[in-house]
UniProtKB/Swiss-Prot annotation:
Single biological process term from Gene Ontology: sporulation resulting in formation of a cellular spore
Keyword Nucleus: yes
Catalysed reactions, as listed in the record: L-methionyl-[protein] + S-adenosyl-L-methionine = S-methyl-L-methionyl-[protein] + S-adenosyl-L-homocysteine
Entry EC no(s): 2.1.1.-
Subunit text: Component of the heterotrimeric velvet complex composed of LAE1, VEL1 and VEL2; VEL1 acting as a bridging protein between LAE1 and VEL2.
Full protein name: Secondary metabolism regulator LAE1
Pfam family for this entry, one: Methyltransf_23
UniProtKB keywords: Methyltransferase, Nucleus, S-adenosyl-L-methionine, Sporulation, Transcription, Transcription regulation, Transferase, Virulence
Broad class of enzyme this protein falls into: transferase
Phenotype of null mutants: Impairs the ability to produce oxalic acid, to colonize the host tissue, and to form sclerotia.
Length: 327
C-alpha cells in the first residue's frame, strides 16, 4: 500500500527490498522484559506492555510541555490539495501518528501519515489515512518515495541512533524540496539544578553518568546531541529554530504551568526508569536486575524529593528542507 501511495504522488521510489527479504524474527525476553527481535540487541529498550504505557504517558507529557499542541507552531504546511503527507520515524506505540492522522484527516481532507518502527507494538485499529511499517530507520527505506513528504517527525530517539548525520541526510532526501518540514523533539536527561541541589555522588547524577556511558559504548548515546544545529546546517536545511523548555523533575516550581509539566514528567520518568536502565546496564556492565532495581529505587527517591530542585531540558528543533535535494 505504501507503493500505491508513492505512485499516486508521482515520487521516485527507493529501491525495492531484496528478494531474500524475510519476516523479522520473534521478540524475546530478557530479565523479565520483552525486547523486539528485529536486529536483536541493537535497540536496548523493551517493547512490552509496561513500555507501551510509558510511551503513552510521555506522549501526554510532551503535549502538556509544548502547550497542548501535537507539533511545534513553527511547523506549518503549504496549501496541499491532498492534505499533508507525514512520516513519523521511531513511531513507538503510534499514538502521535494516530493523533496526527485524526487531526489532518479531518482538518485538511485526506492527509496521510506513515509510522516506522523496529517493533510492531501499534494498535490494530487505526485511522484509514494511517499506516505502520516495521522498519529499521537506519536501514534503507524500501519502497518509500523521495522528495514527497510534507513533514518528517522524530521524537525521543536519543539512545537509538548510531549516525545522526546519516539520518538527517535521509530526512532531507525524502522531504519535499523547499517546503517540507522537519521536527525533532529530544530530552536532555542531564540532571540540572540552579541551586546546587544535585551532589555529584547522588543516585540521580550517578544514574545519568552510567547510563550515558553505557549507551555511548553501544554506539547509540542517550546523551543529548549538542551538534544538531551544525548537522542540519551541513545538510543545508533552512529556517533552523530551537526551542528549549525547562522540565522540572517534580512539582517544585511555583509556576502553575511548570507544576503541571512536572507532574506528567515525574510520572513518565519514574515509570520508565527500569526500561531505560535495565538493558544498557545489564548488557554493557553486566549488572543483574537486582542491581538495577536498587539503583533506580534510589533515583526515584531523588526525582520525587521536592528539596532537590532539579530539571532537564526539552529541545524542540524545527527546520525547512533545502531548495534542492542532495545530488
Amino acid at each position: 500500500m505504501v507503493v500505491a501511495m508513492a505512485m499516486a504522488n508521482n515520487g521516485s521510489l527507493s529501491p525495492a527490498p531484496p528478494a531474500a527479504f524475510q519476516e523479522p524474527p520473534p521478540d524475546y525476553t530478557e530479565n523479565g522484559r520483552l525486547y523486539h527481535g528485529l536486529h536483536k540487541g541493537k535497540y536496548m529498550f523493551p517493547c512490552d506492555e509496561d513500555e507501551k504505557d510509558r510511551m503513552d504517558i510521555f506522549h501526554k507529557f510532551f503535549e502538556v510541555a509544548m502547550g497542548g499542541v501535537l507539533h511545534s507552531r513553527n511547523t506549518t504546511f503549504t496549501n496541499n490539495y491532498d492534505g499533508p503527507r507525514i512520516l513519523d520515524l521511531g513511531t513507538g506505540t503510534g499514538i502521535w501518528a494516530i493523533d496526527m492522522a485524526d487531526k489532518y484527516g479531518s482538518d485538511m481532507g485526506t492527509g496521510e501519515v506513515l509510522g516506522l518502527d523496529l517493533a510492531r507494538i501499534q494498535p490494530p485499529t487505526i485511522p484509514e489515512n494511517l499506516q505502520f511499517l516495521q522498519r529499521d530507520i537506519e536501514s534503507p527505506w524500501w519502497g518509500l518515495e523521495v522528495e514527497s513528504w510534507d513533514m518528517v517527525h522524530i521524537r525521543m530517539l536519543s539512545g537509538s541512533i548510531n549516525s545522526w548525520p546519516a539520518l538527517y541526510q535521509k530526512v532531507r532526501r525524502y522531504l519535499k524540496p523547499q517546503v517540507g518540514r522537519f521536527e525533532q523533539v529530544e530530552i536532555d536527561f542531564t540532571p540540572r539544578s540552579d541551586f546546587g541541589d544535585i551532589p555529584a555522588d547522588s543516585a540521580l547524577a550517578t544514574w545519568a553518568r552510567n547510563l550515558f556511558e553505557a549507551t555511548r559504548r553501544n554506539f547509540r548515546p542517550l546523551a543529548y546531541n549538542t551538534e544538531i544545529r551544525a548537522m542540519l546546517q551541513k545538510e543545508e536545511f533552512l529556517d533552523i529554530q530551537e526551542e528549549v523548555i525547562r522540565i522540572p523533575l517534580n512539582p517544585w516550581p511555583d509556576d502553575p504551568q511548570e507544576k503541571d509539566v512536572a507532574r506528567w514528567y515525574n510520572l513518565a520518568l519514574t515509570q520508565g526508569l527500569e526500561a531505560m536502565t535495565l538493558g544498557p546496564m545489564h548488557r554493557i556492565y553486566g549488572w543483574t536486575k537486582d542491581d538495577v532495581t536498587r539503583l533506580i529505587t534510589e533515583v526515584r527517591r531523588d526525582i520525587c524529593n521536592r528539596k532537590i530542585r532539579a530539571y532537564n531540558n526539552l529541545h524542540v528543533w524545527t527546520a525547512r528542507a533545502p531548495v534542492k535535494p542532495p545530488s
